[in-house]
């Protein structure tokens, strides 16, 4: 483990922003997420969301979760319970609102190639106005809850914050399932995992980050997701105003294409730390924290009235409950997830029973630290090494 002090933090992105050099320079920039208009409400299927997270990493979706997902247990509110963080991105001549996902490597978007009934409410990519089609190239993604998307591939200009590339592979949806259509706030996904797991056939394409990182001061991005508020992505530099104390670095395992790493233990509430570490993935595209069964069971033993519900497809408890904090140990650093974040959402509109923000990884062999974990941290994703850095948010 390496601890990186604030005083040594990389702030080259700030200095390059005021550089007067006429030649193209490397840079750093910040892109803010936004909350979509409050009238863009939708229905989320909590067990379906859980199933997608398991299937995304090749996990087995339990039958009880499949059945719960098929029954459509849901809650309806604007931008439900931090389920997604959306970021404006210019693709060709269109501005779209995308989910930045460190657990996948595709840039796919709603497009005007979709049937008109599936376009309603979404901002659309129009490849005919700006793009070059990659003849014979296709993409096809499916998830454990039955949701799917597929289509053609184009080469086009993509701008995120202060950086533009005119040669980015863009996957335009021509077929998409109702689960995606219903979410009118979200126009697609921008993957920030390693390019090795891009799904384009016959040849995988490069992620936006891998395409533009040579333009950045440093080949990294940092994430500050927030609870009940839009978050921020810093590309090319580290903003020391966004964290407290020091950044603790650990090696990232990219062998499976994800931002994987090893933890050194965990603790529940005020209890002592377990020295049993686990392998994990830092994933902004997963909402929940997915852990080994023994850790999940140990956690909910400390939550009054908690039970594993087949009907709901996971652990639930009274919405009036204050769950204990959950702490992940990384070297000498303790990353604390406040218990209120783990009281995730009512299992249905008006219900007094809530779905837990910690659920089983169903024997996946990896733990997934999604947004419930990440919105308590400032996390640095550095492709040099590669390595991950963690610090408490300021």
Curated annotation (Swiss-Prot):
- Which Pfam families does the record associate with it? Asp
InterPro entries attached here? Aspartic_peptidase_A1, Aspartic_peptidase_AS, Aspergillopepsin-like_cat_dom, PEPTIDASE_A1, Peptidase_aspartic_dom_sf
UniProt keyword terms in alphabetical order: Aspartyl protease, Disulfide bond, Hydrolase, Protease, Secreted, Signal, Zymogen
The Peptidase A1 domain is annotated at 85-391
Under CDD domains, the record lists:
Aspergillopepsin_like (cd06097)
Disulfide partners: 319-354
**Enzyme Commission number(s):** 3.4.23.18
Top EC group: hydrolase
Where's it found, cell-wise? Secreted
The Gene Ontology biological process terms listed for this entry are: proteolysis
Q: A cellular component term (GO) from this record?
A: extracellular region
The yes or no answer to whether the keyword Signal is present is yes
Q: Which reaction does it catalyse?
A: Hydrolysis of proteins with broad specificity. Generally favors hydrophobic residues in P1 and P1', but also accepts Lys in P1, which leads to activation of trypsinogen. Does not clot milk
- State the family it belongs to: Belongs to the peptidase A1 family.
Oligomer status and interactors? Monomer.
Query: What's this protein's name?
Result: Aspergillopepsin-1
- Which organism was this protein described from? Aspergillus niger (strain ATCC MYA-4892 / CBS 513.88 / FGSC A1513)
């Amino acid at each position: 483990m390496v601890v990186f002090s604030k005083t040594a933090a990389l702030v080259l992105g700030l200095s390059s922003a005021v550089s007067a050099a006429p030649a193209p320079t490397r840079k750093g920039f910040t892109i803010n997420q936004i909350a979509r208009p409050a009238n863009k409400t939708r229905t989320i299927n909590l067990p379906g969301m859980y199933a997608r997270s398991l299937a995304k990493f090749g996990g087995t979706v339990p039958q009880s979760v499949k059945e719960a997902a098929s029954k459509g247990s849901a809650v309806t509110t604007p931008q439900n319970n931090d389920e997604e963080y959306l970021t404006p991105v210019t693709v060709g001549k269109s501005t779209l609102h995308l989910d930045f996902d460190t657990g996948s490597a595709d840039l796919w978007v709603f497009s005007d190639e979709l049937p008109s009934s599936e376009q309603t409410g979404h901002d659309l990519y129009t490849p005919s106005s700006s793009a070059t089609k990659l003849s014979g190239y296709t993409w096809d993604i499916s998830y454990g809850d039955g949701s799917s998307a597929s289509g053609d591939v184009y080469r086009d200009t993509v701008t995120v914050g202060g950086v533009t590339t005119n040669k980015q592979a863009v996957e335009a949806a021509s077929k998409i399932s109702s689960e995606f259509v219903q979410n009118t706030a979200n126009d697609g996904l921008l993957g920030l995992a390693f390019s090795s797991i891009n799904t384009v056939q016959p040849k995988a394409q490069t992620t936006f980050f891998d395409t533009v990182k040579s333009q950045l001061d440093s080949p990294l991005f940092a994430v500050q997701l927030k609870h009940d508020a839009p978050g921020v992505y810093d590309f090319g530099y580290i903003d020391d105003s966004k964290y407290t104390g020091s950044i603790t670095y650990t090696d990232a395992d990219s062998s499976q294409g994800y931002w994987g790493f090893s933890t050194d233990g965990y603790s529940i509430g005020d209890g002592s730390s377990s020295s049993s570490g686990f392998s994990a993935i830092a994933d902004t595209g997963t909402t929940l924290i997915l852990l080994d069964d023994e850790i999940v069971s140990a956690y909910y033993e400390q939550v009054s009235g908690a039970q594993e519900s087949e009907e709901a497809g996971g652990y639930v408890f009274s919405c009036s409950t204050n769950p204990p904090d959950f702490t992940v140990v990384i070297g000498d650093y303790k990353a604390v997830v406040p218990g209120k974040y783990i009281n995730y959402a009512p299992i249905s509109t008006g219900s007094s029973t809530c779905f837990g923000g910690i659920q089983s990884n169903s024997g996946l062999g990896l733990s997934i630290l999604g947004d419930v974990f990440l919105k308590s941290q400032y996390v640095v994703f550095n492709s040099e090494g590669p390595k991950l850095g963690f610090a408490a948010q300021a």
